[in-house]
C-alpha cells in the first residue's frame, strides 16, 4: 500500500495532473478491487494517513443472535466477538479491519494495476478535454502532418494532440503541405478511440475575432470591445468596435499605425479585406456606418410582424433578421450614383452590412443633382448664333 501512495507524486508530476485527482483514481481502483476480489457485499473504505493509503473493511456491531449476522457476515460482527477486539465497543458501533495487498493473489494485484493504468489514462484525457473546452474559439497553432485525399488537413498541436482542418473550414484558395505551420480557431473537441480530436476552422468569424485579440492589446485589456463580426472568408469582412475608454479611438487601435495591425491579420487570412467601423446603438447610424464607403441620405427602421409577410417573403427572409417574431427591416435612401458602392461587388458590401447589423436592408434610390440638372436643361433648347445675340438685346 505504501508503494502505491509513493506513486501519486511521481504520476502527478509526469502527467501534469493534480495529486488529489491521482489519489481519487487510486482509491477508486482499490475499492473496486476489494469488491471484486474479496467480498462484493462488504463495505470498504480507503483512508490516507501519513501519506499512506490504507484499505479498510467496515463492520457494524450487532447484538448476539441477530439474523443479519448469518445473512450478511461480511457486514456485521456480534457484540461478543467485537468485545474481544475492543472491550469498550457497543451495539451499532463500527469496527474497521486494515487489509493488506500483500495478502492478495498476484492475479488480483495485476488486475489492480491494469485498471489503475486505464483509469489514469482516462483521467488524463478528461483533464485535457476540460482544458481544451476552456480554449474553444481561441487560436491554436500547429504543424501539418498529413493532407488526405479529401483535402482534410491534419495538424499536430502542442506535440501530442491532433487537430483536423476540413476543406470546408479552409479559406478559398488556400492549400497546405506537410510541414507548414497553421493558425486556426478551435471549434469543437471530440473524443475518439485514438484520443482527443480537435476540430479547427479558419472560416468562422471567431477566427478573425481571435486574431484581433492577439494583435490588438487594447482588446485583451478590455479597453475596446468587438461587438459584431461578419465575414465572407478570404474575400471581405466587417468588424464593429466600441471603446470603453474615451481617450482611445477604437478604429485607430484596431487598424494600427499605417495599418500595420490590420494588415498583419489580413495577410494571415489570405489577404482578406477587413473593414473596421465604430459601433452605435442607434440602428440608423450603425447601418449607415456599415454600408460604407457608400454615402447614405437616410435610414428608416421597420419592424414587421411575421404574420404580415406573404409566403414568398417568409421563404426568402433569413432567420437572423427575425427578432421576437418581427422582421427587422431597414429602408435605406441614397443617391443612385451611390447604390453600386452600397451593394458592392457581387453584393458583398450589403450582405456583410446586413450580417453585421442584423437588419434586412432594402434600397430606395434618388436621382442625383447632376442628373436632375441635365433633365431640366433638356426641357429648353439652347439658343445659338444670331438668335442668341438677339435675345441679349430684348427687354
Swiss-Prot record:
Superkingdom assignment: Bacteria
InterPro entries: KH_dom-like_a/b, KH_dom_NusA-like, KH_sf_prok-type, NA-bd_OB-fold, NusA_bac, NusA_N_sf, S1_domain, TF_NusA_N
Record NCBIfam families: NusA
Alphabetical keyword list: Cytoplasm, Repeat, RNA-binding, Transcription, Transcription antitermination, Transcription regulation, Transcription termination
Provenance organism: Helicobacter pylori (strain ATCC 700392 / 26695)
Pfam hit, one: KH_NusA_C
Protein name as annotated: Transcription termination/antitermination protein NusA
CDD domains: KH-II_NusA_rpt1, KH-II_NusA_rpt2
The keyword Transcription is assigned to this record: yes
Quaternary structure and partners: Monomer. Binds directly to the core enzyme of the DNA-dependent RNA polymerase and to nascent RNA.
Gene that this sequence comes from: nusA
Amino acid at each position: 500500500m505504501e508503494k502505491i501512495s509513493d506513486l501519486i507524486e511521481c504520476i502527478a508530476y509526469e502527467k501534469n495532473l493534480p495529486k488529489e485527482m491521482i489519489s481519487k483514481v487510486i482509491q477508486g481502483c482499490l475499492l473496486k478491487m476489494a469488491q471484486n476480489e474479496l467480498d462484493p457485499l462488504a463495505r470498504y473504505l480507503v483512508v490516507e494517513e501519513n501519506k499512506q493509503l490504507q484499505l479498510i473493511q467496515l463492520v457494524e456491531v450487532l447484538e448476539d443472535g441477530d439474523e443479519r449476522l448469518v445473512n450478511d457476515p461480511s457486514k456485521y460482527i456480534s457484540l461478543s466477538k467485537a468485545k474481544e477486539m475492543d472491550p469498550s465497543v457497543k451495539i451499532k458501533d463500527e469496527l474497521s479491519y486494515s487489509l493488506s495487498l500483500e495478502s492478495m493473489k498476484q492475479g488480483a494485484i495485476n488486475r489492480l494495476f491494469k485498471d489503475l493504468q486505464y483509469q489514469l489514462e482516462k483521467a488524463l484525457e478528461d483533464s485535457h478535454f476540460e482544458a481544451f473546452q476552456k480554449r474553444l474559439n481561441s487560436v491554436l497553432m500547429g504543424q501539418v502532418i498529413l493532407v488526405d485525399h479529401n483535402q482534410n488537413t491534419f495538424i499536430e498541436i502542442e506535440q501530442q494532440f491532433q487537430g483536423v482542418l476540413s476543406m470546408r473550414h479552409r479559406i478559398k484558395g488556400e492549400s497546405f503541405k506537410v510541414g507548414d505551420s497553421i493558425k486556426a480557431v478551435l471549434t469543437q473537441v471530440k473524443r475518439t478511440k485514438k484520443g482527443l480530436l480537435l476540430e479547427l476552422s479558419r472560416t468562422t468569424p471567431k477566427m478573425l475575432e481571435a486574431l484581433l485579440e492577439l494583435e490588438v492589446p487594447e482588446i485583451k485589456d478590455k479597453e475596446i470591445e468587438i461587438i459584431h463580426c461578419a465575414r465572407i472568408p478570404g474575400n471581405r469582412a466587417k468588424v464593429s468596435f466600441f471603446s470603453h475608454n474615451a481617450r482611445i479611438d477604437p478604429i485607430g487601435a484596431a487598424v494600427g499605425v499605417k495599418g500595420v495591425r490590420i494588415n498583419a491579420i489580413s495577410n494571415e487570412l489570405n489577404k482578406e479585406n477587413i473593414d473596421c467601423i465604430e459601433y452605435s446603438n442607434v440602428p440608423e447610424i450603425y447601418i449607415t456606418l456599415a454600408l460604407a464607403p457608400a454615402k447614405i441620405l437616410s435610414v428608416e427602421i421597420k419592424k414587421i410582424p411575421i404574420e404580415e409577410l406573404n409566403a414568398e417573403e417568409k421563404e426568402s427572409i433569413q432567420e437572423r433578421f427575425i427578432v421576437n417574431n418581427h422582421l427587422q427591416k431597414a429602408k435605406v435612401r441614397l443617391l443612385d450614383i451611390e447604390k453600386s458602392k452600397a451593394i458592392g461587388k457581387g453584393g458583398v458590401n450589403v450582405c456583410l452590412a446586413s450580417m453585421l447589423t442584423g437588419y434586412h436592408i432594402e434600397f430606395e434610390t434618388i436621382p442625383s443633382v447632376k442628373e436632375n440638372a441635365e433633365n431640366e436643361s433638356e426641357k429648353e433648347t439652347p439658343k445659338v448664333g444670331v438668335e442668341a445675340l438677339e435675345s441679349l438685346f430684348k427687354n
